[in-house]
Amino acid sequence: MTFSFTATVLGSPRIGPNRELKKAVESYWAGRLDAEGLDALARDLRRRTWTSLRDAGLDSVPVNTFSYYDHVLDTAAMLGALPDRVAGIESDLDRYFAAARGNDTVAPLEMTRWFDTNYHYLVPEISPTTTFALDPSKVLRELEEARALDIPARPVVVGPVTFLLLSKAVGSDAPLLDRLDELVPLYADLLGRLAGAGADWVQIDEPALVADRNPKEIAAAKRAYDRLSGLELRPAILVASYFGSLGDALPAIASTGVEGIAIDLVAGSDTLATVPDLTRKHVVAGVVDGRNIWRTDLDAALASLGTLLGSTGSLAVSTSCSLLHVPYTLDAETGIDKALRSWLAFGTEKVREVVTLGTALTSGRESVDDEFALARAAASTRNTDRRLHDATVRARLDALTASDPGRSPAAERREAQSALSLPVLPTTTIGSYPQTTQIRVARAARRKGEIDEAEYLKRMRAEVADVVALQEKLDLDVLVHGEPERNDMVQYFAEQLDGFFATDNGWVQSYGSRCVRPPILYGDVRRSNPMTVEWITYAQSLTQRPVKGMLTGPVTILAWSFVRDDQPLADSANQVALAIRDETVDLQGAGIRIVQVDEPALRELLPLRAADQPGYLDWSVGAFRLATSGVSDSTQIHTHLCYSEFGEVIEAIARLDADVTSIEAARSHMEVLDDLSAVGFDLGVGPGVYDIHSPRVPGVEEIAASLREALKAVPVERLWVNPDCGLKTRGPAEVEASLRNLVDAAKLVRAEL
């Protein structure tokens, strides 16, 4: 009989507790570290991760969750589905990174958000000529490494249904799921090899099944797992779901011969008692939240587990999803107050909670009474802490009226904004400029106490002056100050708003080597002082051209933070919106004529099921409009959106009512413009004309061709010219070359009009 484990997690972080992987990968890209050195570091990171999970008490440890860049890209490589354009690159590793990042001659794969999280994956491209072929070397190697360390290893792979549903069809309109029969034999081969290598269990992730799926898709998934579970030589199969309820897919998967099903009981609401086939399954219950950082209510979690005991064959405790989405450990946080610390659980602490619940399930709650008592005490102090309830903030929210989130009609605003006297096809950038060595040195010196605040501010003002001078030299029309003072577009504001806490080492992976430190929104939000006015007005004093005020919108601040779970998201969004509204009014009062309120994460919080989406879109649009409706008609409001499948939220983008919307569109080849046209979008739009996530410098004619394509869908008087995202992560030389070509392309197309 297959061994049934009792405590596990669905995945773990891979960047390293001190971002070791990020630094090593970037050193490899820069030529400072060779492939052997990178491999040695990766092997050590895997060893440390697996042994810490085993030693914490997990009796099944996920492996193959490590990745140099992205686990979906790893799956494409495993299935022989990297794009043809990288085939000529000799090195496997360089071919992999070229698909992820591109190079001087190769465009990268598109990137988009992983379901409704702030992690982003590379979108595989599947064409009619794609010939799938199995390369199991990575997963087999990691299994071998783990077994050599006496790790109770459970290999993890992205499932065939999810892989196809998340991929992009190229050169054909046929549904990619029609090719499932081509993939199932490869997975069958993989299962046989894993069994031969000693795997007792394999976890096959199928999170795509928690979104709305039609009967044909569910039937296809059932057929696939009927075939895989019918194999004679294979490990036990755990089909893992997360980020929501399986719904109709649950009985379909339960009716197959797979031994286990992992279910998200934090984000989902599946009623297991209604699925009789689960009485023959090993159910892995995700009762510890893998996406947020709040301490688990152990009493409630154990009660939930208790209700499942009669509905399942056997039961294990787990996180609701991979711990990829939370920081490593609270131990690295030294500046956090005692009360707030007691309310939190990062990765290490969540593993401890899983083990505690597993012990309570198998040995009785009395065996872990102390842990349960600590959890109860933390919940009690959180419920009574005065920081969570600010009477002034609550009164202001209660006083809002239906007219507060509204502005004048767009035509009236356009007339008032004509005083800006901008040319057709005005050029601008999204906001941030490269974080130069000088910026990083100054920031580190201030942190170590080697320079005082006055010297730091002096150096940052010099950076602002350099960025303004560069933009004038390049002849851009609307300028930005470059954001040298900002370490992160959300954390910068969180550090200045009451109700937030910014961690020292709470790093999580956003994509590739890009890591972020999401702040913690734990209480009511209030702005005590202006946050950006001094920086923007200084930049404006250096030029006669308009300089944009740069703010982050309320939805993005929520999406890229760990948000309190004791009140509706809409309430927290409106609190943040009022703080941003006050800042826009202050910027206008200081003479700033254009204010950009970025909402790159608008799509990320969209619920996965259609029935839940209208409510979210109502409050998210309302929060943006509340944040931007305090200014006069003559102040031009911009917003920026990125990493999004805009078709699903395109009407909401129009409802934001921003005067100009810049959109990441370079990797998706301007597809979003057709969606905008279809909903009658009649405001300014700046589709990104080149991809800043790739180090390649686009040519003038390449950018001009993108502009000509955009003009087929957008009237010239409404089209803006900009990159598709901020320039923070790029090098100064490539930024200058790219922007020079952008301006030259705009001038070229203007001359053709």
Swiss-Prot record:
GO terms for molecular function: 5-methyltetrahydropteroyltriglutamate-homocysteine S-methyltransferase activity; zinc ion binding. Disulfide bonds: none annotated. Keywords: Amino-acid biosynthesis, Metal-binding, Methionine biosynthesis, Methyltransferase, Repeat, Transferase, Zinc. Catalyzes the transfer of a methyl group from 5-methyltetrahydrofolate to homocysteine resulting in methionine formation. Its cofactor is Zn(2+). Coiled coil: none annotated. InterPro entries: Cbl-indep_Met_Synth_N (IPR013215), Cobalamin-indep_Met_synthase (IPR006276), Met_Synth_C/arc (IPR002629), UROD/MetE-like_sf (IPR038071). 5-methyltetrahydropteroyltri-L-glutamate binds at R19, E20, L21, K22, R113, R514, C515, W560, E604. GO terms for biological process: methionine biosynthetic process; methylation. This is 5-methyltetrahydropteroyltriglutamate--homocysteine methyltransferase. Its EC number is 2.1.1.14. Belongs to the vitamin-B12 independent methionine synthase family. The gene is metE. L-homocysteine binds at I430, G431, S432, E483, D598. It catalyses: 5-methyltetrahydropteroyltri-L-glutamate + L-homocysteine = tetrahydropteroyltri-L-glutamate + L-methionine. Zn(2+) binds at H640, C642, E664, C725. Binds 1 zinc ion per subunit. The keyword Zinc applies. It comes from the Bacteria. Pathway: Amino-acid biosynthesis; L-methionine biosynthesis via de novo pathway; L-methionine from L-homocysteine (MetE route): step 1/1. The active site is at H693 (proton donor). L-methionine binds at I430, G431, S432, E483, D598.
